[in-house]
Regions:
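Phosphate/adenylate-binding "loop-and-lid" substructures adjacent to NTP/NAD/dNTP-binding pockets
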Residues: 1-102
Length: 102
């Protein structure tokens, strides 16, 4: 049970960091603030250090092999799936902002 929760959190944090790094580095936008991104990155780094056997089995393991929480610049943000998700989130974010203005 714990290993499933750890794996799910590692996957979630990896995807969040990948997508939001893509938004930032490829599209020159920011949806989450730096403090939130850093919190996710530190949590991921700690989980990967505490549970390396689980982390090695979770999606995107190779991309996060030597990850430290300092930057998302070297992550594979140009992956087509990541770029598509980043675009979807930017569209959703824009729609939410437009709805708030009404």
């Amino acid at each position: 049970m714990i290993s499933e929760q750890v794996a799910a959190t590692i996957k979630q944090r990896r995807l969040q960091l990948l997508v939001h790094s893509c938004v930032y580095y490829e599209f020159n936008q920011s949806i989450v603030d730096d403090a939130t991104w850093a919190k996710w990155a530190v949590e991921l780094e700690q989980l990967q250090a505490a549970y390396p056997a689980i982390a090695d089995k979770v999606e995107w393991a190779a991309a996060f092999k030597d990850f430290d929480h300092s930057t998302g610049y070297n992550l594979p943000v140009r992956d087509p799936w990541i770029m598509r998700k980043a675009r979807q989130i930017m569209i959703w974010h824009e729609r939410m902002n437009n709805n708030d203005k009404m």
